Amino acid sequence: MGIESSCDETGVGIVRWHPDGTCELLADEVASSVDQHARFGGVVPEIASRAHLEAIVPAMRRALSAAGIAKPDALAVTIGPGLAGALLVGVAAAKAYAAAWDVPFYALNHLGGHVAVDTLEHGPMPPCVALLVSGGHTHLLHVTDLAAPIVELGSTVDDAAGEAFDKVARLLGLGFPGGPALDAAARDGDPHAIAFPRGMTGPRDPRYDFSFSGLKTAVARHVEAAQRAGVAIADLPIPDIAASFQEAVADVLTMKAVRAAQDMGVDTLVLGGGATANSRIRSLAEERCAAAGLTLRVPKPRLCTDNGVMIAALGAHVIAGGARPSPLTVASDPGLPVSVSQIA
């Protein structure tokens, strides 16, 4: 069983490990508080924590019922990174259930879960590069084994890509969450209408790092210039702005991800995280992987967003790799680095 509570989704998932290295999905329960955050234009940590408190026990019961079991053989939980208060709810629940059931407890990394969940659809994972893109994270990772430490090749130096989507969507009056709203608006737009900048793509820039604050600022300045010229927000070419912004983000993400895979000598690229549900990120990744001779693995959108199944899948791989259980005294770590797969 895996429990996830790092942001605004309360997830409980159950998987069964098979000797051939595959995981079978038995239960996937997710309760989201996203509607409670919409009027604030972003996730409010206190609201998220209270929502987890209300949702965690019912989600546990539903998952056990769906799997047809009384208790799991082991229990894994997201110990970090994430919102401090949100993490505390999931970790406290996991410790209590593990103690009551007398089952092994594993404190795992949220980001590793986003990689591991792909095995539910595509089977055992070969050495690969993983691109994780969400509201709080943008990382390029080198993965040799899900039971081994993951190497971070690069990350964003400022805004996460998903955060930039949310902020630009709010600027354009498209609402929250911004990712789906921008994606929908961009479908009717011209991705080449506006030449927005591609951050950190110069010859002297870090090879695998990202920056989206300049792009976000460029969109804001474009809108401000139109407003100074007397154009109201409602009269702006929103589809063109959305499509051009989305193209800039997808261009940089996929270019650097394919480059990293080639540099690492692997033939597989894995996408994970909620923002990889974006249609342009997926389609451009497909185009560039095909051109580079890489295999692209992308979980279905439901598994890309936060869920308990991803933590259960990571837990199954960690256990199969011989990891010892975590002590019940471990504390959640909101800033846990991706290189720490488990706090033991």
Swiss-Prot record:
It comes from the Bacteria. The keyword Amino-acid biosynthesis does not apply. It is an enzyme of class 2 (transferase). Substrate binds at residues 132-136, 166, 179, 183, 278. It catalyses: L-threonylcarbamoyladenylate + adenosine(37) in tRNA = N(6)-L-threonylcarbamoyladenosine(37) in tRNA + AMP + H(+). Pfam families: TsaD. Fe cation binds at residues 110, 114, 306. One of its GO terms (cellular component) is cytoplasm. Its cofactor is Fe(2+). Its EC number is 2.3.1.234. InterPro entries: ATPase_NBD, Gcp-like_dom, KAE1/TsaD, Peptidase_M22_CS, TsaD. It is found in: Cytoplasm. Binds 1 Fe(2+) ion per subunit. One of its GO terms (molecular function) is N(6)-L-threonylcarbamoyladenine synthase activity. Keywords: Acyltransferase, Cytoplasm, Iron, Metal-binding, Transferase, tRNA processing. One of its GO terms (biological process) is tRNA threonylcarbamoyladenosine modification. HAMAP family: TsaD. Belongs to the KAE1 / TsaD family. Required for the formation of a threonylcarbamoyl group on adenosine at position 37 (t(6)A37) in tRNAs that read codons beginning with adenine. Is involved in the transfer of the threonylcarbamoyl moiety of threonylcarbamoyl-AMP (TC-AMP) to the N6 group of A37, together with TsaE and TsaB. TsaD likely plays a direct catalytic role in this reaction. This is tRNA N6-adenosine threonylcarbamoyltransferase. It comes from Nocardia farcinica (strain IFM 10152).
